[in-house]
Swiss-Prot record:
Biased composition (Polar residues): 249-260
GO BP, sorted A to Z: leaf morphogenesis; petal development; proximal/distal pattern formation; regulation of DNA-templated transcription
Organism (species): Arabidopsis thaliana (Mouse-ear cress)
Classification lineage: Eukaryota, Viridiplantae, Streptophyta, Embryophyta, Tracheophyta
Descriptive protein name: LOB domain-containing protein 36
One Pfam family linked to the record: LOB
Gene designation per UniProt: LBD36
Length: 313
């Protein structure tokens, strides 16, 4: 019961004296008159009093709050009342649960180690066995399936980078092996087969130095199909071909006979050396034998040249 000066909102609305046994006094304070007005208009004071008397004291406050909520909703919407709001909220809750289930199913296909099996198995099972020489159409189908599987398999970029580095390393190894074979060929040519004349040894060393130094200047003459320079119009400058295809100057002589002999003398060994240098795939073991054969061919030429010089002298 409220104080003697201020009765409860229910007794004030009903215009009656509020006593100590008033059932409305604890739940309808005097400062909330609208609360009892809504409840009384919808349910009636006698019905509310009867309901509160049937409930326990610890449940009465919740019952009064629910009655006020229902009465307010009914006055706002006389057709549906609070049922309309409840149905709308239930429909939204059902839609949210449906969307949540779909999201979980979609997420399950991308998460976990077993998520790849339902995706990859249909693609591999659908591919028929291809012949040894597939046609262009089957090759295009295989390429398309390959490109479709790559995004799903999610190959990391680090693996591609490792493959590129491996290819670069293999290319460097091949280049090093080729360079080693070339150096081995040069060493075999320079040190193979002892010569009987120091003139031929000096000539071989000079040819190796000319090959390492690159192209020398060519003052005059023209290159023929065989790779040798022809004589100029004056006939005073004769140029030969050094080892490896480099053109070098030959000392000029006044004797045309000796010039022809020098050209003929250089023609055979240089062609033989060119065959050795420009075919690196052959083994380097028969190189000393070839050098000895070349020297045996040049020895009769040098002896005949010395005999002719003695006759002329």
């Amino acid at each position: 019961m409220a104080s003697s000066s201020s009765p409860c909102a229910a007794c004030k609305f009903l215009r009656r004296k509020c006593t100590q046994e008033c059932v409305f006094a604890p739940y309808f304070p005097p400062d909330q008159p609208q609360k009892f007005a809504f409840v009384h208009k919808v349910f009636g004071a006698s019905n509310v009093a009867k309901l509160l008397n049937e409930l326990a004291s610890n449940q009465r406050e919740d019952a009064v709050n629910s009655l006020f909520y229902e009465a307010e909703a009914r006055l706002r919407d006389p057709v549906y009342g609070c049922v309309g709001l409840i149905s709308i909220l239930q429909h939204r809750l059902k839609q949210v649960n449906h969307d949540l289930e779909n999201a979980k199913k979609e997420l399950a296909t991308y998460v976990g180690p077993q998520a790849m099996l339902p995706i990859l198995q249909p693609h591999f099972m659908s591919l028929p066995p291809q012949p040894q020489r597939p046609s262009s159409s089957s090759a295009s189908v295989l390429t398309q399936h390959h490109h479709n599987l790559l995004p799903m398999m999610a190959i990391p970029t680090g693996q591609l980078y490792h493959q590129q580095q491996q290819q670069i390393f293999e290319a460097q190894q091949l280049a090093a092996v080729a360079r080693e074979q070339q150096n081995e060929m040069f060493r075999a040519y320079g040190g193979g087969g002892g010569s009987s004349s120091p003139h031929h040894q000096n000539q071989a060393q000079a040819e190796i130095l000319r090959f390492n130094n690159g192209f020398d200047s060519v003052p005059a003459g023209s290159v023929t199909v065989t790779g040798f320079n022809q004589l100029s119009s004056g006939g005073t400058a004769v140029t030969g071909m050094s080892l490896g295809g480099n053109f070098v100057d030959s000392p000029s002589t006044n004797n045309n006979y000796h010039t022809d002999q020098q050209l003929h003398h250089h023609h055979q060994p240089q062609q033989h050396h060119e065959a050795q240098l420009f075919i690196p795939s052959q083994s380097s073991q028969p190189l000393p034998l070839q050098t000895q054969e070349t020297q045996t061919q040049t020895q009769p030429n040098s002896e005949s040249e010395e005999g002719r010089r003695n006759v002329i002298g």
